[in-house]
Amino acid sequence: MAKAEEHIASGIIGDIKHVDTSFSSSLVDLFQGIPLSESDDHTFKPLASTWSDPSKAGGYGWGQLSHMFAGMYKITKLNPEKVFCMSVPSPTGVDYTDAISLRFEGGVTGAFSGCAYVPKGYGGGYNIRVHGDKGSLFLDFEINRERLLVRTNDGQEINEKTEVGCGTHAYTTQKPINTLVDICLGKEYHNHGDVSINLKMVRTLDAAYRSMKSEKLEIA
């Protein structure tokens, strides 16, 4: 993701005009109030209400699309302006799916999709496509097809080699823990999820949930 951020910042795809992104996972059980089956043999199990209670920020948006939007804002630096969202509700009243349209500052448009209906054992996926007036960037985290590809209008193609298996399922807690220790020790570090990124993510999802209820376009 940091490499994608560098490519966009270099100007190789020009001014961003449109972003389309999707995030999918196997979490229908959680959003209907059933404990996560993958945690059956764990000592500490997450409370299902964390994801299924609408009064506790339950739902696919807060539970999963927070990751999607944070990643998108990290690499694009866009600022949200207006949001419209439709969803499929779970029995507990939270969102199983999200179909979100965005208008960013400067007139950039975006289409964003979230879905909890991936079959168990598959893992789901996460991809970001950024289209500019000089080219496009394709970033895919789905397991066994990870890629970072840049194509420009003048025929350039940059294909960053990614080792198979380094996508969505390669994440561990080791790097965040190491970073926290570095901060405590006063060492230099790079914050890949700073407050500006997270603020834009919260503004976007807050507007999306307001739009679900109002069925209208909402200001982010």
Regions found by a protein language model. Give the residues of each.
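Predominantly a Rossmann-like dinucleotide-binding segment in NAD(P)-dependent oxidoreductases
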Residues: 1-84, 91, 215
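C-terminal hydrophobic helical "lid"/dimerization subdomain
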Residues: 196-213
